[in-house]
Amino acid sequence: MKKLLLGLSLLLAIAIFAVSCSKDDNGNDVVLPGKANSFLTASFKGSKNVKLSKVNDNLTKKEFEVILDNGIKIEFDKDGNWVEIEAVKDVGTIPSEFVPKDILDYVTEHYLGLGINSIEIEDDGYEIELTDGTDLDFDLDGVFIKVDK
């Protein structure tokens, strides 16, 4: 009788576990903050979300990730502010409108012929990745700090 009761308990536990894990988090129920939606609508007219997911990365403050059909990936914080914009899928470069003018001028002057593959805003400034893989750090005012290897 003990074995039967133990067996039924184990079977019930497995059934409950299977039901609770059956719904994968595929992003369909993820809702972006209004500010993020407004940003996407204004900045990427005509592009569609290919993938939307919730990231919850406390270290980098990234909460949401959107990949657009044009190959641009945008990561947002919990309030809907973009924290990283990156060109994926061999797109090459991100639109320059997201890069502060001083940073864009520096890259144009010192890295002729290279584009910006990604920009990430951090608490103390910006990190830029060029199309050749070089990482550059700038302060919040767009002043060059260093090449980050």
PLM segments and residue spans:
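First exposed extracellular module after export/assembly in secreted or surface-exposed proteins
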Residues: 28-149
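Sec-dependent N-terminal signal peptides
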Residues: 6-14
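Bacterial signal peptide processing site
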Residues: 22-25
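C-terminal motif of bacterial Sec signal peptides marking the signal peptidase cleavage site
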Residues: 17-20
